Amino acid sequence: MLLIITNQEDIHPNPVIDHLIALKVPFFRLNTEHLFSHYDVYYQISNDTNEFCIRTKDGHHSITSKQISAVWERRPCKPMTTFDPIEDEQLANLLKEEGDGFMKYLRIALHELPWIGHAVNEYKAGSKLLQKIVASKVGFNIPQTIFSNNLSDVEQFKTEKIAVKPIRAFGFEISEQENLIFYTSLTNKEKLRDLGEMNFRNNLNFLESYIDKQYEVRTTIIGKADFSAIIESQQFEADKGKIDWRQGYDHGMTFKAFEIPRSIATQCLDFLAYFNLEFGCFDFIVDKNDTYHFLECNTNGQWMWIEDETQLPISEAIALFFMTHHENKAS
Protein backbone atom coordinates (compact mmCIF):
# COMPACT_ATOMS: atom_id res chain seq x y z
CA MET A 1 0.00 0.00 0.00
CA LEU A 2 1.22 3.47 -0.93
CA LEU A 3 1.31 6.20 1.72
CA ILE A 4 0.71 9.65 0.16
CA ILE A 5 1.76 12.48 2.48
CA THR A 6 0.46 15.87 1.37
CA ASN A 7 -2.25 18.46 2.08
CA GLN A 8 -5.89 18.69 1.09
CA GLU A 9 -5.35 21.51 -1.43
CA ASP A 10 -2.65 19.63 -3.38
CA ILE A 11 -4.17 18.57 -6.72
CA HIS A 12 -1.10 16.79 -8.13
CA PRO A 13 -1.92 13.42 -6.53
CA ASN A 14 -5.43 13.36 -8.04
CA PRO A 15 -4.61 12.12 -11.58
CA VAL A 16 -2.11 9.65 -10.10
CA ILE A 17 -4.79 8.36 -7.74
CA ASP A 18 -7.09 7.81 -10.74
CA HIS A 19 -4.40 5.61 -12.30
CA LEU A 20 -3.74 3.82 -8.99
CA ILE A 21 -7.43 2.94 -8.75
CA ALA A 22 -7.43 1.65 -12.34
CA LEU A 23 -4.30 -0.41 -11.61
CA LYS A 24 -5.81 -1.70 -8.35
CA VAL A 25 -2.94 -0.32 -6.27
CA PRO A 26 -4.10 0.42 -2.70
CA PHE A 27 -3.16 3.78 -1.22
CA PHE A 28 -3.73 5.93 1.85
CA ARG A 29 -3.75 9.72 1.53
CA LEU A 30 -2.68 11.58 4.66
CA ASN A 31 -3.48 15.31 4.56
CA THR A 32 -1.22 16.51 7.32
CA GLU A 33 -3.05 19.74 8.16
CA HIS A 34 -5.85 17.49 9.51
CA LEU A 35 -3.54 15.18 11.49
CA PHE A 36 -5.42 15.59 14.78
CA SER A 37 -8.93 16.19 13.46
CA HIS A 38 -9.19 13.42 10.84
CA TYR A 39 -6.79 10.63 11.87
CA ASP A 40 -5.93 8.25 14.69
CA VAL A 41 -2.19 7.57 14.84
CA TYR A 42 -0.44 4.72 16.64
CA TYR A 43 3.27 3.79 16.58
CA GLN A 44 4.83 1.27 18.98
CA ILE A 45 8.55 0.56 19.26
CA SER A 46 10.16 -1.91 21.63
CA ASN A 47 12.84 -4.58 21.54
CA ASP A 48 10.23 -6.90 20.03
CA THR A 49 8.04 -4.53 18.06
CA ASN A 50 8.19 -1.82 15.41
CA GLU A 51 4.70 -1.22 14.11
CA PHE A 52 2.32 1.58 13.28
CA CYS A 53 -1.22 2.19 12.15
CA ILE A 54 -2.80 5.36 10.79
CA ARG A 55 -6.55 5.30 10.23
CA THR A 56 -9.22 7.83 9.42
CA LYS A 57 -11.45 8.65 12.37
CA ASP A 58 -14.48 7.27 10.53
CA GLY A 59 -12.67 3.90 10.40
CA HIS A 60 -13.09 3.51 6.65
CA HIS A 61 -9.42 3.73 5.66
CA SER A 62 -6.14 2.73 7.29
CA ILE A 63 -2.52 1.85 6.61
CA THR A 64 -0.21 -0.27 8.76
CA SER A 65 3.48 -1.02 8.89
CA LYS A 66 2.76 -4.47 7.43
CA GLN A 67 0.88 -3.02 4.46
CA ILE A 68 3.06 -0.09 3.45
CA SER A 69 5.06 -0.65 0.25
CA ALA A 70 6.19 2.89 -0.67
CA VAL A 71 5.90 6.55 0.31
CA TRP A 72 5.10 9.59 -1.81
CA GLU A 73 5.77 12.88 -0.10
CA ARG A 74 4.19 15.74 -1.99
CA ARG A 75 3.38 18.89 -0.02
CA PRO A 76 2.87 18.17 3.69
CA CYS A 77 2.18 21.10 6.00
CA LYS A 78 1.86 21.63 9.74
CA PRO A 79 -1.34 20.56 11.52
CA MET A 80 -3.79 23.46 11.43
CA THR A 81 -6.02 22.48 14.35
CA THR A 82 -6.18 20.20 17.35
CA PHE A 83 -9.08 17.76 17.71
CA ASP A 84 -10.65 19.82 20.48
CA PRO A 85 -10.54 23.62 20.64
CA ILE A 86 -7.65 24.82 22.84
CA GLU A 87 -8.22 28.29 24.26
CA ASP A 88 -4.59 28.84 25.20
CA GLU A 89 -2.99 29.82 21.87
CA GLN A 90 0.55 29.06 23.01
CA LEU A 91 -0.47 25.59 24.14
CA ALA A 92 -2.37 24.99 20.89
CA ASN A 93 0.69 25.99 18.86
CA LEU A 94 2.93 23.76 20.98
CA LEU A 95 0.66 20.77 20.39
CA LYS A 96 0.59 21.42 16.65
CA GLU A 97 4.39 21.68 16.64
CA GLU A 98 4.56 18.31 18.40
CA GLY A 99 2.31 16.81 15.74
CA ASP A 100 4.46 18.29 13.00
CA GLY A 101 7.56 16.93 14.73
CA PHE A 102 6.08 13.44 14.83
CA MET A 103 5.31 13.58 11.10
CA LYS A 104 8.87 14.64 10.29
CA TYR A 105 10.30 11.83 12.40
CA LEU A 106 7.86 9.31 10.91
CA ARG A 107 9.09 10.16 7.42
CA ILE A 108 12.69 9.70 8.55
CA ALA A 109 11.82 6.37 10.19
CA LEU A 110 10.41 5.15 6.85
CA HIS A 111 13.53 6.13 4.89
CA GLU A 112 14.39 2.58 3.80
CA LEU A 113 11.17 2.19 1.80
CA PRO A 114 10.90 3.14 -1.89
CA TRP A 115 10.07 6.84 -2.12
CA ILE A 116 9.23 9.69 -4.39
CA GLY A 117 10.04 12.89 -2.50
CA HIS A 118 12.44 11.15 -0.10
CA ALA A 119 12.38 12.94 3.26
CA VAL A 120 16.06 12.32 4.06
CA ASN A 121 17.81 12.28 0.69
CA GLU A 122 15.98 15.30 -0.67
CA TYR A 123 17.49 17.58 1.96
CA LYS A 124 20.98 16.77 0.72
CA ALA A 125 19.90 17.06 -2.92
CA GLY A 126 18.44 20.51 -2.28
CA SER A 127 21.88 22.06 -1.85
CA LYS A 128 22.49 24.47 -4.74
CA LEU A 129 26.22 24.00 -4.22
CA LEU A 130 26.23 20.20 -4.16
CA GLN A 131 23.91 20.07 -7.17
CA LYS A 132 26.48 21.94 -9.26
CA ILE A 133 29.31 19.71 -8.02
CA VAL A 134 27.42 16.49 -8.75
CA ALA A 135 26.15 17.78 -12.11
CA SER A 136 29.72 18.40 -13.20
CA LYS A 137 30.80 14.97 -11.94
CA VAL A 138 28.16 13.13 -13.98
CA GLY A 139 29.16 15.02 -17.13
CA PHE A 140 26.72 17.91 -17.43
CA ASN A 141 27.91 21.26 -18.69
CA ILE A 142 27.30 23.81 -15.94
CA PRO A 143 27.52 27.62 -16.01
CA GLN A 144 30.37 29.21 -14.09
CA THR A 145 28.84 29.78 -10.65
CA ILE A 146 29.98 32.01 -7.79
CA PHE A 147 28.47 32.41 -4.32
CA SER A 148 29.99 35.46 -2.66
CA ASN A 149 29.45 38.50 -0.45
CA ASN A 150 32.60 40.19 -1.79
CA LEU A 151 32.08 42.45 -4.79
CA SER A 152 35.60 41.93 -6.13
CA ASP A 153 34.79 38.26 -6.79
CA VAL A 154 32.57 39.35 -9.68
CA GLU A 155 35.77 39.90 -11.67
CA GLN A 156 36.29 36.13 -11.72
CA PHE A 157 33.50 35.72 -14.27
CA LYS A 158 34.63 34.94 -17.80
CA THR A 159 31.43 36.39 -19.27
CA GLU A 160 30.12 39.94 -19.02
CA LYS A 161 26.47 38.91 -18.65
CA ILE A 162 25.56 37.41 -15.27
CA ALA A 163 22.40 35.79 -13.92
CA VAL A 164 21.41 36.61 -10.33
CA LYS A 165 19.41 33.91 -8.53
CA PRO A 166 17.90 33.28 -5.09
CA ILE A 167 19.60 30.60 -3.00
CA ARG A 168 16.64 29.65 -0.88
CA ALA A 169 14.31 32.61 -0.35
CA PHE A 170 11.67 32.73 -3.06
CA GLY A 171 10.01 35.97 -2.00
CA PHE A 172 8.05 37.60 0.77
CA GLU A 173 4.61 38.99 1.50
CA ILE A 174 4.18 42.72 0.91
CA SER A 175 0.53 42.71 1.95
CA GLU A 176 -2.37 40.27 2.17
CA GLN A 177 -3.05 40.96 -1.51
CA GLU A 178 0.51 41.13 -2.85
CA ASN A 179 3.64 38.96 -2.76
CA LEU A 180 7.10 39.77 -4.08
CA ILE A 181 8.56 36.78 -5.95
CA PHE A 182 12.30 36.48 -6.60
CA TYR A 183 12.95 35.45 -10.20
CA THR A 184 16.26 35.01 -11.98
CA SER A 185 17.41 38.40 -13.26
CA LEU A 186 19.99 39.40 -15.84
CA THR A 187 22.77 41.85 -15.02
CA ASN A 188 26.42 42.43 -15.91
CA LYS A 189 29.71 43.22 -14.24
CA GLU A 190 29.35 46.96 -14.68
CA LYS A 191 25.92 47.06 -13.03
CA LEU A 192 27.17 44.95 -10.14
CA ARG A 193 30.14 47.26 -9.65
CA ASP A 194 27.76 50.22 -9.61
CA LEU A 195 25.87 48.62 -6.71
CA GLY A 196 28.83 49.28 -4.47
CA GLU A 197 30.34 47.10 -1.77
CA MET A 198 27.71 47.97 0.84
CA ASN A 199 24.86 46.65 -1.30
CA PHE A 200 26.78 43.49 -2.12
CA ARG A 201 28.32 42.46 1.19
CA ASN A 202 25.04 42.09 3.11
CA ASN A 203 23.93 39.10 1.05
CA LEU A 204 25.46 35.78 0.02
CA ASN A 205 24.92 36.40 -3.69
CA PHE A 206 24.21 33.49 -6.06
CA LEU A 207 25.62 34.39 -9.48
CA GLU A 208 25.96 32.42 -12.73
CA SER A 209 27.44 33.15 -16.12
CA TYR A 210 24.46 33.96 -18.32
CA ILE A 211 24.12 31.64 -21.31
CA ASP A 212 22.30 32.92 -24.38
CA LYS A 213 19.50 30.47 -25.06
CA GLN A 214 18.13 28.83 -28.15
CA TYR A 215 15.39 27.30 -25.99
CA GLU A 216 14.94 25.64 -22.60
CA VAL A 217 14.04 22.09 -21.60
CA ARG A 218 12.28 20.65 -18.56
CA THR A 219 12.91 16.94 -18.03
CA THR A 220 10.98 14.89 -15.47
CA ILE A 221 12.47 11.57 -14.34
CA ILE A 222 10.38 8.85 -12.66
CA GLY A 223 12.42 5.74 -11.92
CA LYS A 224 14.07 5.01 -15.27
CA ALA A 225 11.47 6.84 -17.38
CA ASP A 226 12.07 10.36 -18.70
CA PHE A 227 9.62 12.94 -20.03
CA SER A 228 10.79 16.21 -21.54
CA ALA A 229 9.18 19.41 -22.73
CA ILE A 230 10.72 22.16 -24.81
CA ILE A 231 10.10 25.71 -23.57
CA GLU A 232 10.17 28.36 -26.30
CA SER A 233 11.04 31.17 -23.90
CA GLN A 234 13.15 33.40 -26.14
CA GLN A 235 10.25 34.97 -28.04
CA PHE A 236 9.14 36.76 -24.85
CA GLU A 237 10.34 39.98 -23.24
CA ALA A 238 12.93 39.85 -20.46
CA ASP A 239 10.41 40.21 -17.63
CA LYS A 240 7.80 37.96 -19.27
CA GLY A 241 9.74 34.71 -19.47
CA LYS A 242 12.87 35.23 -21.57
CA ILE A 243 15.20 35.28 -18.56
CA ASP A 244 13.15 33.13 -16.17
CA TRP A 245 10.50 31.08 -18.00
CA ARG A 246 8.35 30.89 -14.86
CA GLN A 247 7.38 34.51 -15.54
CA GLY A 248 5.82 33.40 -18.82
CA TYR A 249 2.87 31.54 -17.31
CA ASP A 250 0.57 34.54 -17.69
CA HIS A 251 1.90 35.60 -21.08
CA GLY A 252 1.08 32.63 -23.28
CA MET A 253 4.27 30.61 -22.92
CA THR A 254 3.84 27.15 -24.44
CA PHE A 255 5.42 23.76 -23.79
CA LYS A 256 5.80 20.93 -26.31
CA ALA A 257 6.76 17.28 -25.84
CA PHE A 258 10.39 16.78 -26.74
CA GLU A 259 12.94 13.95 -26.87
CA ILE A 260 16.25 14.76 -25.21
CA PRO A 261 19.49 13.02 -26.26
CA ARG A 262 19.99 9.65 -24.55
CA SER A 263 23.30 10.88 -23.16
CA ILE A 264 21.50 13.68 -21.28
CA ALA A 265 18.84 11.27 -19.99
CA THR A 266 21.58 8.95 -18.72
CA GLN A 267 23.29 11.84 -16.92
CA CYS A 268 19.95 12.70 -15.27
CA LEU A 269 19.71 9.12 -13.97
CA ASP A 270 23.31 9.24 -12.75
CA PHE A 271 22.63 12.53 -10.97
CA LEU A 272 19.60 11.11 -9.12
CA ALA A 273 21.47 7.88 -8.35
CA TYR A 274 24.12 9.91 -6.50
CA PHE A 275 21.40 11.11 -4.13
CA ASN A 276 19.55 7.77 -4.11
CA LEU A 277 16.43 9.41 -5.53
CA GLU A 278 13.83 8.15 -8.01
CA PHE A 279 12.30 11.44 -9.10
CA GLY A 280 13.56 14.80 -10.29
CA CYS A 281 12.60 17.75 -12.49
CA PHE A 282 15.65 19.01 -14.41
CA ASP A 283 15.97 22.45 -16.00
CA PHE A 284 18.33 22.92 -18.94
CA ILE A 285 19.36 25.72 -21.25
CA VAL A 286 20.12 24.64 -24.81
CA ASP A 287 22.41 27.17 -26.47
CA LYS A 288 22.66 28.09 -30.15
CA ASN A 289 25.18 25.27 -30.69
CA ASP A 290 22.63 22.71 -29.35
CA THR A 291 24.72 22.22 -26.20
CA TYR A 292 22.83 21.39 -23.01
CA HIS A 293 23.64 23.33 -19.82
CA PHE A 294 22.37 22.06 -16.46
CA LEU A 295 20.73 24.71 -14.29
CA GLU A 296 19.13 22.79 -11.43
CA CYS A 297 17.09 19.78 -10.38
CA ASN A 298 13.96 20.15 -8.28
CA THR A 299 13.67 16.76 -6.60
CA ASN A 300 10.02 17.29 -5.68
CA GLY A 301 9.00 19.56 -8.52
CA GLN A 302 5.63 20.25 -10.08
CA TRP A 303 4.75 18.41 -13.28
CA MET A 304 0.99 18.49 -13.81
CA TRP A 305 1.12 21.66 -15.91
CA ILE A 306 3.53 19.88 -18.28
CA GLU A 307 1.19 16.90 -18.57
CA ASP A 308 -1.77 19.21 -19.26
CA GLU A 309 0.15 21.10 -21.97
CA THR A 310 1.92 18.19 -23.66
CA GLN A 311 -0.17 15.10 -22.85
CA LEU A 312 2.99 13.37 -21.63
CA PRO A 313 1.85 10.45 -19.38
CA ILE A 314 3.71 11.58 -16.26
CA SER A 315 0.95 10.78 -13.75
CA GLU A 316 0.56 7.30 -15.23
CA ALA A 317 4.32 6.72 -14.95
CA ILE A 318 4.22 7.68 -11.26
CA ALA A 319 1.35 5.24 -10.67
CA LEU A 320 3.22 2.48 -12.52
CA PHE A 321 6.31 3.16 -10.40
CA PHE A 322 4.30 2.61 -7.23
CA MET A 323 2.50 -0.40 -8.72
CA THR A 324 5.86 -2.11 -9.26
CA HIS A 325 6.81 -1.65 -5.61
CA HIS A 326 3.37 -2.80 -4.45
CA GLU A 327 3.75 -5.98 -6.50
CA ASN A 328 7.30 -6.51 -5.21
CA LYS A 329 6.04 -6.37 -1.61
CA ALA A 330 3.16 -8.72 -2.38
CA SER A 331 5.39 -11.33 -4.06
Regions found by a protein language model. Give the residues of each.
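A short beta-strand-loop structural module common to alpha/beta enzyme folds
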Residues: 26-38, 167, 172
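A long amphipathic alpha-helix within ATP-dependent nucleotide-binding catalytic cores
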Residues: 198-205, 209-210, 221, 238-291, ...
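Extreme N-terminal starter segment of soluble prokaryotic enzymes
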Residues: 1-3
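A short beta-strand motif that forms the metal-chelation/ATP-contact edge
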Residues: 162-165, 219-221, 290-305
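Phosphate-binding site of ATP-dependent enzymes
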Residues: 20, 159-257
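Conserved N-proximal alpha/beta basic substrate-recognition cap immediately N-terminal to
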Residues: 7-19, 30-142
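Short acidic-glycine loop/turn motifs at beta-strand connectors
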Residues: 46-48, 57-58, 221-226, 287-290
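Loop-centered beta-sheet repeat module
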Residues: 130-182
